[in-house]
Each structure stands twice: as C-alpha cells, then as structure tokens.
Amino acid sequence: MRVVILGSGVVGVASAWYLSQAGHEVTVIDRQPGPAEETSAANAGQISPGYAAPWAAPGVPLKAIKWMFQRHAPLAIGLDGTSFQLKWMWQMLRNCDTRHYMENKGRMVRLAEYSRDCLKALRDTTGIQYEGRQGGTLQLFRTAKQYENATRDIAVLEDAGVPYQLLEAKRLAEVEPALAEVSHKLTGGLRLPNDETGDCQLFTTRLAAMAEQAGVTFRFNTAVDALLQEGDRIAGVKCGDEIIKGDAYVMAFGSYSTAMLKGLVDIPVYPLKGYSLTIPIAQEDGAPVSTILDETYKIAITRFDQRIRVGGMAEIVGFNKALLQPRRETLEMVVRDLFPRGGHVEQATFWTGLRPMTPDGTPVVGRTAYKNLWLNTGHGTLGWTMACGSGQLISDLISGRTPAIPYDDLAVARYSPGFTPARPQHLHGAHN
C-alpha cells in the first residue's frame, strides 16, 4: 500500500519507519529542509511514561489565576483573537476534575508505557544511538503539600504497574548526587526508575536516515496546500502544482494539523508554546545524571552527553514563536537553583516550539470518518515519549493488524457525544 505521511517530526518519522517495516511504500512530506526542524528540535529530552499526565488537572483553574501574578509561572495565557482558542480552553477546564484527570492520565500512561517498550525494541533491533540514558526520572517537590499530593499520581502508577520510589529529601542525592548541595530547598521526590532520556532531534534524524535506506521517500522543502477529498476518501495532497497520491494518508503535522484538516475533520488540537535552553556542561559532578522534573515550575532538566537541556513553560498564545527574555530567565533561575555548578548557562542556546495539545491531554491517534485518512497528532509535551508507540499503533491499524494495546479511546471519535470504547480499556501497556 502507498502511504503518504504529512510531517517529519518524531511522530511522523516514527510512523514512516513502522509502516515501511510493515511492507508499505511510504512518502513523507514536510515544508522544512529536514526532519525534526520544528517541535521535535529541542524539547526537554524526557521519555517519561509514568509522568504522562494532562495539564487539565484538579486545582489547575485556581492555580492559573495565581500564576497570572507570578514572575516565574509555568502557565501563561494570551488571547489570540480566535473563537477556537476560547472553545479549547473551555474544553480543557471541563477536564479539570478528578474523574477526567484519572481517565485521561490512565490512557496517556497506557500509550506512553507501550511506546517505551517499542523504543526499546527498536533500539535492540537497530542499535540506534541518540545520547540516550536509562537512568529514570526524578520529580522534585519543594513543598510538603506537593509531597502529600503525590499519592494521587501513585494510585495511577500502581494501577498501571509502573515501578516508583517516593523519596524523602535526604535520599534524593542517592539518585542525583549533585542535589546534595540543595536538599534543604526540597521536601522530597518521586522517582520512576524505568524512565529514559535522549536527544529527540538526533533520534529523529537518524531514524529518518534508516527509514530512507529502507525505502521511505522524503519530500522536504515541500509545502502542503490542501488535502483533496472525493466522497468518503482522500484523493491526494496538493503541493503547489503537484498532486501527491497514495492509498492511505497520515496527518502528523502537529499543531498545524487542525488548520490542514479544516472542513474535513474537526480536531481540538491547539499549539502550546514551550521553551528550552541547551547548556554546555561545566562541572560533571555538579550536573544531573539523568532527568529532573521541578514540580513547582513544571520545568525539566535533562542530561545529554556533554549538554544539559532545560525545558518547560506553557503559553496558550496561538502561533506566536517570539523568544521572550522573561521565559529564559525562568529556565536559567531553575537550573541555577538546583544545579549551580552544572552548566555554562551564559553559553546556552534559547529555543521555542509549539506542542500540539488536546484539551484532555491524550493524543489523537487512529482512523477518521474518511476511509483512508488517519491521524497521529496532538501529543502535546509527550511527542518524544509517545512517538514509537503511536507509530507502531498507526502502522498496525493501517495494515489491518490488531494493536497490542486498547486504542479506541485514542481516536478522534472520543470527542463525539455518547462515545463509549468498543472494547474494555486498561491502563496496562504491552509489557504487562
């Protein structure tokens, strides 16, 4: 089967890889000159299934009001003048209760756990290298209340069979030695030993090269104007004067998927702006060993070989990609506070990207009402974490194979009134 994939970020390239391995003839189209040039370029580097959770959570509405008056707030909102933004924020608010949070987090963890299993299998099979580490993730708490609230997430982790360690402040240095210098600022941490890290752009670039060697065609520097519809099918992709045809089409344009699908499929995917710093290592013993998540500021600090990646923030401001100095100052403040000797912060590279976010946090992966149009988008801050699992899942569905995990509640149909999954849903990934 000829499959056309729109988008060469980590999700699009992973989809191309798994589809090509399933025997399909795959073409990837992207406006950029190469893979992973936008949202996948400089993300936080975490592969953290256990921390897969929606931004829509109990207490967030009140916190959002408080954050409006804080200098280093993790969330900021700026009206972009569209009714779509207002509708999206209203849908997000409706998911900020305990029932929705547990349901959304459960299916996110399910896909993320499966995705990590797929990544491990890919690594074992191909030997792909991307400055990856398998040292776990440590979520840091600065207040007693944060430490106490960890029990809510632990309940989901236990249900999903995800190993964890709840650590008091004095034990944090056992897993991250450099934190010994700042343990007095912390109340404890939640460690997920099975989580991983890695350079997403490096992974995507190398996987794209492997996919090309396997027969995948990449059409870079090619802007997509429209999807052409004929009845209940997509007839082709219009790129300037050219029409690229396939038997099946996969939408993996991230935040730009919504506009490209307008008039065809209504998906609630909105750009969530984030920032990162990439910092050269200064002192090895003062740098993180694996990856840290600061619960207060919602900022991740990840170790690559000779670099530290600091990523976070969430701005609901539309397609605004301006690099704002106050956001840089927040990232610098957090990394200096936790790892004062770790990196040459003054030499950092500052970056911003748009994460494709759904109001319930779960990506949109699966079929549409069109017989040959499939979606693989809306992964939010977890594109790197969920890419391989989403790619394998979409490959299985297009190939007519039964996926290894429940998938009905990942499709866009879940937003339809009265939707109920076609089969029982579980949190467990393929490893269980």
Curated annotation (Swiss-Prot):
Its recorded reaction(s) are:
a D-alpha-amino acid + A + H2O = a 2-oxocarboxylate + AH2 + NH4(+)
GO terms under cellular component = cytoplasm; plasma membrane
Disulfide connectivity for this sequence is none
Q: What is its biological role?
A: Oxidative deamination of D-amino acids.
**Which of the seven top EC classes does this enzyme belong to?**
oxidoreductase
GO biological process annotations for this chain's record? Answer: D-alanine catabolic process
Write down the species: Klebsiella pneumoniae (strain 342)
| Pathway participation | Amino-acid degradation; D-alanine degradation; NH(3) and pyruvate from D-alanine: step 1/1
Protein name from the UniProt record: D-amino acid dehydrogenase
Q: Which Gene3D superfamilies match?
A: D-Amino Acid Oxidase, subunit A, domain 2, FAD/NAD(P)-binding domain
Q: Which cofactor does it need?
A: FAD
As for family, the record states:
Belongs to the DadA oxidoreductase family.
The residues listed in the UniProt record as binding FAD, with positions renumbered to this chain, are 3-17
Task: Alphabetically list the UniProt keywords.
Answer: FAD, Flavoprotein, Oxidoreductase
PANTHER family hit by this protein: D-AMINO ACID DEHYDROGENASE, SARCOSINE DEHYDROGENASE-RELATED
Which Pfam families does the UniProt entry name for this protein?
A: DAO
Record EC number:
1.4.99.-
Q: Which InterPro entries match?
A: DadA, FAD-dep_OxRdtase, FAD/NAD-bd_sf
Single GO MF annotation: D-amino-acid dehydrogenase activity
Which SUPFAM superfamilies does the record cross-reference, listed alphabetically?
Answer: FAD-linked reductases, C-terminal domain, FAD/NAD(P)-binding domain
Do you know which HAMAP family this protein is assigned to? DadA
Q: Where is the signal peptide?
A: none
Asked whether the keyword Metal-binding is assigned, the reply is no
Q: Which NCBIfam families match?
A: PRK00711.1
Task: Give the domain of life.
Answer: Bacteria
